[in-house]
Regions:
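Extended substrate-binding grooves/exosites of carbohydrate-active enzymes
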Residues: 1-160, 164-172, 177-185
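Solvent-exposed serine/threonine-rich low-complexity stretches and specific carbohydrate-binding patches
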Residues: 187-196
């Protein structure tokens, strides 16, 4: 490593051929691309001795990344997981002006007459080429929200909140209000004191 203050990983460390001894002690993390949750559990519950990180997961192609909530729950319930990096940030396309319907046109995968290309496989980001969010980014943002409601006692009108931030008291930035409606009409509303 050029910088000893940085953690090292090597995704291909998972591939062994059984013909030679591999030396992985210099790696700080065990990393994988696209493992299932059961594969991660097998490593963690087995003899895995390094923190587990997904160097790619939840491919954002098509109508977005899937299983984000399942992965979040797994990361949260296993201390040896470090989370992961969703593939990928931005659709790769070239702006070609406005179409007849006045919508933006983007070229990709053969649109410029090239013979060798990746088709629509370059359109796999969390944002469009102009950086507008896809629905997948909004889902990802929601999954990683800093505070969640984890319970509600209807009898006593008590909400239970879970603060996922390590160093911030939710009272420092969160305000809570409510509205109770009946047939679209507000019956009552108010503010709620935020617990620490």
């Amino acid at each position: 490593s050029y910088d000893s203050s940085r953690l090292t990983h090597y995704e291909s460390a998972q591939y062994t051929d059984g013909k030679r001894k591999y030396e992985y002690s210099i790696l700080d993390l065990y990393s994988r691309m696209y493992p299932s949750i059961s594969e991660m559990a097998e490593y963690i519950d087995g003899d895995g001795d390094k923190p587990y990180i997904l160097c790619e997961y939840c491919h954002a192609m098509g109508n977005g990344p899937g299983d984000l909530e399942d992965y979040f729950q797994f990361f949260d319930s296993h201390e040896t997981t470090c989370g992961g990096f969703v593939w990928e940030w931005c659709d790769h396309a070239i702006y070609r002006g406005k179409a007849a319907n006045c919508k933006d046109m983007y070229a990709y995968g053969g649109d410029s007459g090239e013979t060798i290309h990746d088709g629509n496989f370059c359109m796999d980001g969390l944002v469009y080429p102009d950086r507008r969010p896809h629905t997948g980014l909004l889902e990802f943002k929601n999954i990683n929200r800093p505070v969640r409601i984890t319970g509600y006692d209807e009898t006593n009108g008590v909400l239970t909140l879970h603060n996922y931030m390590d160093f911030t008291d939710i009272r420092d930035y969160l305000t809570m209000s409510y509205e109770v409606t009946c047939d679209g009409q507000v019956v009552t509303s108010g503010n709620i004191d935020v617990p620490s």
